[in-house]
């Protein structure tokens, strides 16, 4: 009975270690189903990492009585709220795969700059020990999304057609209340944006490859 979950975990780990299809000379082309499975696993991992980091930051720096009011004030703070991206699964299902990939790429690229400051801000290795690897994980997911775009668009992704935007960098002055609130807001947006990217990828994967695990 224990073999099933263990096999699934080993398969998930193996997929996370797979290269993307850019190394054409060294590896054969990866099936589209594997590209989607790989991207979904990476997005899930990043979303969980973002959620855990947000929760630990909140626990360490934000008094419990202030959290709800601060979260409400930050509702319109995220850049992703200013673009016509789907806000949930139902809306995502109304968009084409190419549209969803472009929105996913935009969300990922908007964080490539800011997350490079994570390891400077969150120096507690017990709480934020993986923060210095977030950039590499985002770059890896970016490559995976671009590989999917090449497959579905039958050519190179037209990145120039996407309005590129980025968030402010994280503030390293953790003794300032303003800096704490800014970083809290950024982490909230990071978690929200990674959840959107994960949702888009899962919607695409499920409608292309019917699975029993599509409910989410």
Swiss-Prot record:
Q: Which residues carry this modification: Phosphoserine?
A: 131
Gene3D superfamilies noted in UniProt: 1.20.1250.10
Q: Which GO terms describe its cellular component?
A: extracellular space
Q: Which domain of life is it from?
A: Eukaryota
Residues recorded as binding Zn(2+), renumbered to this chain, are: 45, 198
Gene Ontology BP terms: animal organ development; growth hormone receptor signaling pathway; positive regulation of growth; positive regulation of receptor signaling pathway via JAK-STAT; response to nutrient levels
| Annotated InterPro entries | 4_helix_cytokine-like_core (IPR009079), Somatotropin (IPR034975), Somatotropin/Prolactin (IPR001400), Somatotropin_CS (IPR018116)
UniProt cross-references to Pfam families, sorted A to Z: Hormone_1
Does the keyword section mention Secreted? yes
Please name the CDD domains in this protein's record. Answer: somatotropin_like (cd10285)
Where does the UniProt annotation locate this protein?
A: Secreted
- Signal peptide region: 1-26
Q: Write out the function statement from the record.
A: Plays an important role in growth control. Its major role in stimulating body growth is to stimulate the liver and other tissues to secrete IGF1. It stimulates both the differentiation and proliferation of myoblasts. It also stimulates amino acid uptake and protein synthesis in muscle and other tissues.
Q: What is this protein called?
A: Somatotropin
This protein's gene is called: GH1
